[in-house]
């Protein structure tokens, strides 16, 4: 895909993630035989407005040491849906030759079980410098996203969007046909809500609350 759009792609994998300052991506993926990695795609004019897309790329989610029930694990190859969506959107943007400076970040991992798996009770220092105590290893999506979001924020893009299969609580709240949307941008919220109706792919805005 990158070659079609003449985009540049870099990736950091395995132990290099620790050296480069992405400890939560490494922690979630280190138990797998497939090395965790951060994929970084860039495209467009340096003079164009910056847009950054971040997609959750959990290629399989066993739940880690807080193992999922077998029925819940069956479809967890779909836990990379966020990554698939941002790649599809990036492909559309490049094919349409939109006047934007695009960056795509995908933390790609498998949340597996082994002797090296991260554990409930572990305390991990994230890329932003904040520490997080692991309460449940099956809440891995927010961990890999936090390092990617911290990296994306360093370049201060004009628009930053992340897409993720983040929690079953969204299904409890909204059912199976409506996706949850969170944003602090009122104009963007209105435009996305309107277009979701037009495209018959509905979104429902939920509040962001800092506590």
Show which residues each predicted segment covers:
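A generic structural signal for tightly packed, nonpolar segments enriched in small/aliphatic residues
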Residues: 2-211
């Amino acid at each position: 895909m990158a070659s079609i759009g003449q985009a540049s792609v870099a990736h950091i994998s395995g132990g290099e993630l620790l050296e480069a300052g992405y400890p939560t991506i490494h922690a979630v993926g280190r138990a797998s035989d497939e090395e965790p990695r951060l994929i970084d795609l860039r495209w467009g004019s340096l003079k164009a407005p910056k847009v950054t897309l971040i997609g959750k790329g959990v290629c399989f989610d066993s739940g880690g040491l807080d193992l999922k029930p077998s029925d819940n694990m069956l479809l967890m190859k779909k836990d990379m849906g966020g990554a698939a969506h941002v790649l599809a959107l990036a492909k559309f943007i490049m094919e349409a030759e939109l006047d934007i400076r695009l960056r795509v970040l995908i933390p790609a991992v498998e949340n597996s079980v082994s002797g090296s798996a991260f554990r409930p009770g572990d305390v991990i220092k994230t890329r932003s410098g904040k520490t997080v105590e692991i309460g449940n290893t099956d809440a891995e999506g927010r961990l890999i996203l936090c390092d990617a979001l911290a990296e994306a924020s360093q370049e201060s893009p004009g628009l930053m969007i992340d897409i993720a299969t983040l929690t079953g609580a969204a299904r409890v709240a909204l059912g199976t046909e409506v996706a949850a949307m969170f944003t602090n941008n009122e104009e963007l919220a209105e435009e996305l809500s309107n277009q979701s109706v037009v495209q018959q792919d509905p979104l429902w805005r939920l509040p962001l609350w800092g506590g």
